[in-house]
Amino acid sequence: MLLRDLVPRHGCCWPSLLLHCALHPLWGLVQVTHAEPQKSCSKVTDSCQHICQCRPPPPLPPPPPPPPPPRLLSAPAPNSTSCPAEDSWWSGLVIIVAVVCASLVFLTVLVIICYKAIKRKPLRKDENGTSVAEYPMSSSQSHKGVDVNAAVV
């Protein structure tokens, strides 16, 4: 079925062209679905014999053997029916004591830091309204009115 057979010689070709484009894939689908698979070489012509060779594919090689089990580095333990030895309670006690001691040290350091922070003198207001920290060295020098950069003779 060719396009020139469908196109009329004297009229518009669009309807027939659209019909051809719509039906051509369907025609190919019908031909593929009605085809029969080849079952033997007796139905094959000489031109096809060279292409298909009608031989069964060679068998697949056997799968490789499974790997051997891993070797144990130590001698295998004898199968015993006795209960496993109970863990000593000392190891658990040592861990608990270590955690408690570490917690006490942490809390002691925290209390010391908080005590020093509370004991520190609060900020005082300077004459011009800015906040100045009172440290022991700076407060004694600032009230004397001595210039820090002045040389002592």
From Swiss-Prot:
Residues 56-70 form the PRAD domain. It is found in: Cell membrane; Cell junction; Synapse. It is a single-pass type I membrane protein. Keywords: Cell junction, Cell membrane, Disulfide bond, Glycoprotein, Membrane, Neurotransmitter degradation, Signal, Synapse, Transmembrane, Transmembrane helix. Glycans are attached at N79. Its main location: membrane. Residues 59-71 have a biased composition (Pro residues). The chain crosses the membrane at residues 93-113. It comes from the Eukaryota. Residues 36-92 are extracellular. Residues 114-153 are cytoplasmic. GO terms for cellular component: anchoring junction; plasma membrane; synapse. Residues 1-35 form the signal peptide. Predominantly expressed in the central nervous system, including in the brain. Also expressed in muscle, heart and kidney. Isoform 1 may be predominant in the cortex and striatum, while isoform 2 is more abundant in the cerebellum. One of its GO terms (biological process) is establishment of localization in cell. GO terms for molecular function: enzyme binding; protein-membrane adaptor activity. Required to anchor acetylcholinesterase (ACHE) to the basal lamina of the neuromuscular junction and to the membrane of neuronal synapses in brain. Also able to organize ACHE into tetramers. Interacts with ACHE, probably through disulfide bonds. The proline-rich attachment domain (PRAD) binds the AChE catalytic subunits. This is Proline-rich membrane anchor 1. It comes from Mus musculus (Mouse).
